[in-house]
Design a protein with these regions (language model features):
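Catalytic metal-binding core of the metallo-beta-lactamase
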Residues: 1-110
Length: 110
């Protein structure tokens, strides 16, 4: 789910960077994507677990809507422990965005 992770990471980092709480940010993203059933289900799952007091890492790791790359999960885990969530989310968003562009270019070249 590269493009999805890129979008999620960029949106979440933007809200968190503005000083918004993670739960509020997840709710806003969920409201913006309510018409996308699978993505909305993913966000609702995250929101529920975060409301229960679980970390973003735990919520991402426990949800079953999308498979998450291990390096993404571990990056989020370290970011949560070190207080560097915004820069890590920005880097992850950029990484997945670049990866999607390269994949598209390779597909077009073939």
């Amino acid at each position: 789910p590269g493009p999805l992770l890129s979008s999620f990471a960029k949106e979440l980092s933007s809200y968190l960077n503005s000083g918004m709480a993670i739960l509020t940010a997840i709710r806003l993203i969920e409201d913006q994507h309510q018409h996308e059933k699978k993505y909305a289900s993913f966000l609702a799952s995250l929101r529920t677990m975060i409301e229960e007091g679980k970390s973003l890492y735990h919520a991402l790791n426990s949800q079953s809507v999308y498979g998450m790359p291990d390096f993404f999960l571990q990056s989020i885990n370290v970011a949560g422990q070190s207080g560097k969530m915004v820069p890590v989310l920005i880097q992850m968003g950029n990484f997945f965005s670049t990866q999607a562009k390269i994949k598209k270019q390779v597909g077009n070249a073939l």
